[in-house]
């Protein structure tokens, strides 16, 4: 590990602007995990340059050039960033202005960041450009498609509003999430609003919901499917035109969940899909399991409960053609 700083001071300069010259900070072979074992592993080398400036409302100009020689997947406790390169300005009011900072990710993806963070007013306004970014830029799991588009983050630093518009080439998604804050009680709720997933020629999914980030952590999620074709998202998923809705509620702190599903006339793998389900679960107890699903000649029906003494769960399955469910299934049951 090596860390050094260098600057030049001119104590007899004519102006404050000229008293402190360029400040150079260099670091090499820095591994966060060496300082705290729970931190991710990396080998960081960086050059940071700052130039004090006391004219035109600017207090500090700077740049950062950081490289990570041991970039790796986040799910292996590495940092999935290869390089960060860009410039910034801090004005005399404490506002940080970011000018096109580029973030090189693990594989082929990159993120461009610009905007401002106003520390005095507790406000931020950031624009992120997403370029050719895939799941393999972050984790080991490989998910089809690479994203291009934009993410905008603005509002209070503790409760920002996030809008996105992203396209994978065969599907696009847009939507908004924000944090609703009760400042008196110090409680925050995460809200999902107008979330859409739209495959090319594959219908769409719409979702909205909320998650309380305090006490019992109450959850509510509503999903509506309109002629949705799962195969347009991933070729390994079954072809179809799915219409229906899912309503999920829960209390995470109590491991308590309830869900309802209703299919309107739909198709999956070339045969009709219909039915409904009503399920309730609490702390390892399936208290309600009402399902009545039909996929072609396959029928699945359940009713009852499971998990406690005296419970009885009735299951009636007729599945002469398992291939209709996809996922490589075949035969009969």
Residue ranges and their predicted role:
Residues 1-333:
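Interface amphipathic segments
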């Amino acid at each position: 590990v090596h860390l050094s700083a260098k600057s030049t001071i001119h104590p007899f300069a004519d102006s404050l602007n000229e008293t402190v010259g360029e400040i150079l900070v260099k670091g090499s072979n820095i591994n966060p995990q060496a300082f705290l074992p729970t931190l991710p592993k990396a080998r960081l080398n960086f050059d940071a340059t700052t130039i004090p400036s006391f004219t035109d409302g600017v207090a500090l100009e700077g740049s950062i050039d950081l490289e990570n020689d041991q970039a790796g997947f986040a799910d292996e406790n590495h940092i999935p960033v290869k390089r960060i390169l860009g410039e910034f300005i801090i004005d005399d009011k404490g506002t940080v202005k970011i000018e096109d900072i580029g973030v090189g990710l693990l594989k082929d993806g990159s993120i461009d960041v610009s905007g401002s963070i106003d520390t005095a007013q507790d406000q931020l306004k950031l624009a992120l450009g997403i370029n050719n970014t895939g799941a393999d830029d972050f984790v080991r799991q490989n998910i089809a498609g690479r994203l291009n588009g934009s993410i905008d983050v603005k509002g209070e630093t503790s409760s920002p509003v996030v809008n996105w518009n992203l396209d994978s080439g065969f599907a696009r998604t847009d939507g908004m999430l924000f944090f609703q804050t009760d400042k008196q009680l110090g409680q925050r709720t995460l809200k999902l609003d107008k979330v859409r997933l739209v495959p090319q020629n594959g219908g769409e999914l719409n979702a909205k919901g909320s998650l309380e980030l305090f006490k019992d952590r109450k959850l509510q999620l509503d999903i509506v499917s309109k002629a949705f074709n799962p195969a347009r998202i991933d070729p390994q998923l079954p072809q179809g035109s799915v219409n229906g809705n899912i309503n999920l509620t829960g209390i995470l702190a109590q491991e308590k969940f309830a869900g309802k599903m209703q299919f309107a006339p739909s198709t999956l793998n070339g045969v009709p899909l219909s039915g409904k389900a009503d399920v309730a679960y609490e702390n390892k107890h399936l208290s309600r399991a009402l399902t009545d699903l039909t996929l072609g000649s396959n029928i699945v029906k359940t009713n009852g409960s499971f998990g406690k003494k005296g419970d009885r769960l009735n299951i009636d399955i007729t599945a002469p053609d398992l291939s209709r469910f996809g996922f490589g299934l075949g035969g009969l049951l």
